[in-house]
A protein has these predicted regions:
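Short secondary-structure junctions and interdomain/linker hinges
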Residues: 53, 65, 69, 160-163, ...
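Sequence-level motif detector for i,i+2 pairs with an aromatic at +2
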Residues: 70, 75, 80-95, 99-103, ...
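Carbohydrate-active enzyme catalytic cores, enriched for enzymes
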Residues: 288-448, 497-499, 504-505
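Non-catalytic C-terminal accessory modules of carbohydrate-active enzymes
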Residues: 392-539
Length: 539
């Protein structure tokens, strides 16, 4: 026991020394607009080149700052789950929660090896640099008052900066989806500094800032390190936005967060403007008129909703909602309605394409967040309160003909019968060759779950598993000799969502010389008849 205590004590002393040894970064002050009245003490100290005094004044300012509100954190009502507490505690010994698919979590060594890659899955390497355990460490610190969490967080934060310098790589190298093509320093940069991961840190470090700023370990010198690093992150996003898709949405929303949460930066207003302009543009490009997102994946549809809503919430609480047009807000609500229609009574969504199942508490939490934006919407209130308040959508069956999602439904409660069919156009990267597939919910159970997805990319072994989950033959649709679909462009021939015999007829040119026509009949809102026709001369 004495040996263990000695090791722990030595470890924390080592961490404390590392934190205290950080050099004050006086260039941080040049990044800020010191003309703001609240920063007059900082400005005066800088004018005298009293950098320690300036850093202390700046830290005092941030510890007492008013006027900036964070919609994702109430410091008076912090809650930590058992899972988050475990992440925080494990992180003290450098066992980092990185990916749910790889449990138990890996240990990255006493001298943290940020390049450790135990399984050649790109997501494992990318997601390490999202630092998912940092915010739980902050919650654990605020709730317990135990300085060990703050000391270790500050140590890991600086350690990451020192071991992951930003150097130039080709933009396309950030998005390579298999292992081993990029060598040397560039290999680590493409993982640590991929714009999506950078944006993730940009967002989450606003929370960590609030949780740790009052800690003795959050020193004036550390503050200058933090601000310089944060500014570097923001500029990297602005200069390396992804070309399209959900990555671009995440990056834009998070640059809005950066500009709103740190208005002291000279470029803060332009950061916010950049993000809002992209979101306003992309919501028109990425969302069909029926409210479906063009990935044609329920999980990424949900992610897009939350991206658009997070930006709105940040705007609401900080007084710039007017920068989003009414059409933007209306589209977000339409997307929520779409999502409500494709989900089952237990709040789970079909695992079409790369979708993940989700869990009830998180889904209810989504509706609760959405209700803050749409407080007068009775059907959002219904799902936010698990049916205790409000009223459900006024119809049952629903068709989204542009994106190709069709729901037969006889109720909204647990004992309902629900079928969701996916039969739409060619989707984006996360969409799978599964046109005509369906899931069926009956009396509290999903009787026909879709295959879902594996991890996204990695070495040959990882890709073998990835491709197994993607293949058409593991979906609930017709195949020829178990080959993947050659074409995914379904056409709706008939959609009749009312009456005692509700009908969907959809066609897709699955293969050369073979068209698949699937007709679904929902009879008396009680049972289904599915008729499959293979039309053509294919052999």
């Amino acid at each position: 026991m004495r040996t263990v205590r000695y090791i722990l004590t030595a470890t924390f002393l080592f961490i404390a020394v590392c934190v205290e040894a950080q050099q004050l970064r006086k260039e941080a002050f040049a990044l800020l607009n010191l003309e703001q009245p609240a920063l007059e003490k900082v400005k005066a100290a800088c004018a005298r080149q009293h950098w320690d005094e300036a850093a202390q004044a700046l830290l005092d300012y941030y510890r007492h700052r008013n006027g900036v509100v964070h919609p994702d954190l109430d410091l008076q009502n912090i809650k930590i789950s058992k899972e988050e507490q475990k992440w925080a505690d494990d992180a003290l010994g450098h066992t980092f929660f990185v990916h749910k698919g790889y449990q138990p979590s890996y240990n990255y060594g006493k001298d943290i090896n940020w390049e450790y890659w135990p399984v050649q899955d790109n997501e494992l390497r990318w997601q390490l640099h999202r630092h998912k355990w940092f915010t739980p460490m902050g919650k654990a610190y605020r709730l317990s008052g135990d300085e060990k969490y703050a000391k270790e967080w500050a140590y890991q934060y600086i350690d990451w900066i020192e071991k992951n310098p930003l150097t130039e790589v080709e933009p396309e190298e950030y998005e390579l989806v298999s292992a081993g093509e990029v060598k040397g320093d560039a290999e680590n940069v493409r993982f640590a500094w991929r714009p999506l991961e950078v944006s993730n840190r940009l967002q989450d470090q606003t929370l960590q800032f609030l949780l740790f700023v009052n800690s003795p370990s959050f020193t004036p010198a550390f503050l200058t390190e933090f601000l310089v690093n944060y500014h570097r992150h923001a500029l990297h996003i602005l200069n390396n936005y992804s070309a399209q898709g959900n990555h671009l949405l995440f990056e834009a929303q998070r640059i809005v967060y950066a500009g709103a949460f740190f208005p002291e930066f000279k470029e803060a207003a332009s950061w916010r403007e950049s993000g809002i302009n992209i979101l306003n543009r992309e919501i028109k490009k990425q969302v069909y008129t029926d409210g479906g997102h063009y990935e044609l994946d329920p999980h990424y549809h949900l992610a897009a909703i939350n991206i658009f809503c997070k930006a709105l919430r940040m705007a609401d609480v900080n007084g710039f909602r007017q920068e989003f047009p009414a059409g933007y807000v209306g589209t977000v609500k339409h997307m929520i309605e779409f999502y409500s229609n494709v989900c089952f009574p237990d709040y789970s969504n079909p695992c079409f394409s790369d979708a993940k199942l989700g869990n009830r508490s998180a889904e209810v939490g989504n509706y609760q967040d959405w209700l803050k934006i749409f407080p007068d919407c009775e059907w959002i209130r219904y799902y936010a309160t698990e049916g205790r308040e409000g009223s459900p959508l006024s119809y049952l069956s629903h068709g989204a003909l542009d994106s190709g999602f069709f729901t037969f439904r006889n109720g909204w409660k647990q004992d309902a019968t629900v079928m969701v069919v996916k039969a739409g156009p060619k989707g984006e990267w996360h969409c799978q060759p599964d046109n005509g597939t369906f899931e069926l919910w009956f009396n509290g159970r999903n009787l026909f779950p879709d295959s879902g997805s594996y991890v996204y990319a990695g070495d040959d072994e990882v890709m073998k598993l990835r491709n197994w989950f993607r293949q058409t033959s593991v979906h609930n649709t017709l195949t020829l000799d178990e080959k993947n679909l050659q074409t995914t462009e379904s056409v709706t021939r008939l959609w009749q969502p009312e009456g005692n015999e509700q009908i969907l007829v959809t066609e897709n040119p699955h293969y050369e010389d073979l068209k698949h026509r699937r007709s679904v009949f929902f009879v008396d809102q009680a049972y289904f008849v599915i008729v499959d026709e293979a039309v053509g001369n294919a052999r």
